[in-house]
């Protein structure tokens, strides 16, 4: 039996090595694709191409008796690596006549990411940090674009302290709140103004499939090329007004981060045994715990700034607290029927999204379980 098992495992090892050879060949081809895309200014990520390719491979897998979900999982991971590989090949310069780009806060993580992407796209990039401020007027005197990438609580102050910029200079900020920084930029500069919010962390590796929100400020025709450049990097652009942006971010960021903070605080105060929780956890709880731990591995100032960026955030969090109290009252009353009625009402509100989220979450949970030690 042992000899038979060993022989089969040896065959599996041979197949795995053949897979490695094929993956290496695919990455070589991807590198060539990256060079072509870079030369012609084509975006890294083309959703139609990806969807068509995955649909074809799923059909072919089914015909071979291979689970379609398996080949899709494998290909999605391979494509993620491919996007990172293409990233390193550089990008076409869509505005070759642009004067130097100056990133204020260029030593921060997001500032460094934009410095890297703009550099890969052939632009001259300079950075301006607090120790360089005495030279700010000189550094900014011939800037073609200035990107503000500083902590939220400093954004408006830094914008107000900018020396006069060239009239055609594009002033951009990357803050995760938009209305007040946008108004500050419009007041500080008479030229083109653009508000951006990258909806991802600086450790993403590639901008492929990442969302970048933009809010028009002034003279959008002057920065249209920059939006197109971001699309070439592979990102998905979403346009919204600054006011609507901040209203949505109250849910996406402020409320979510506060709830995560409160849950982490509760775990710490209860002094639970984390190792034991992890050993006993289901995939969904392990994933949730990872998201909580991830928050506390990052900069507390950033999250304090996001959560406390407006009074409307506090009002929303208070309403959440109130509904928590209403839900606890159901438990205190032992009213299962009222609980079920509330559950069904929320289910109806989610509509078809609930079933779609159920399907989407399955793949996330499988992946979380696969990576379990």
UniProtKB/Swiss-Prot annotation:
Pathways involved: Amino-acid biosynthesis; L-tyrosine biosynthesis; (4-hydroxyphenyl)pyruvate from prephenate (NAD(+) route): step 1/1; Metabolic intermediate biosynthesis; prephenate biosynthesis; prephenate from chorismate: step 1/1
Keywords from the named record: Amino-acid biosynthesis, Aromatic amino acid biosynthesis, Cytoplasm, Isomerase, Multifunctional enzyme, NAD, Oxidoreductase, Tyrosine biosynthesis
Pfam families hit by this protein: CM_2 (PF01817), PDH_C (PF20463), PDH_N (PF02153)
GO BP: chorismate metabolic process; tyrosine biosynthetic process
SUPFAM superfamilies (alphabetical): 6-phosphogluconate dehydrogenase C-terminal domain-like, Chorismate mutase II, NAD(P)-binding Rossmann-fold domains
GO molecular function per UniProt: chorismate mutase activity; NAD+ binding; prephenate dehydrogenase (NAD+) activity; prephenate dehydrogenase (NADP+) activity
Record carries keyword Secreted: no
Gene3D superfamilies in UniProt: 6-phosphogluconate dehydrogenase C-terminal like domain, Chorismate mutase, NAD(P)-binding Rossmann-like Domain
Reaction catalysis annotation: chorismate = prephenate; prephenate + NAD(+) = 3-(4-hydroxyphenyl)pyruvate + CO2 + NADH
Domain Chorismate mutase: 1-90
Disulphide-bridged cysteine pairs: none
GO CC annotations on file: cytoplasm
Location of this chain's protein in the cell: Cytoplasm
Protein name: T-protein
Species of the source: Enterobacter agglomerans
Gene name, Swiss-Prot/TrEMBL: tyrA
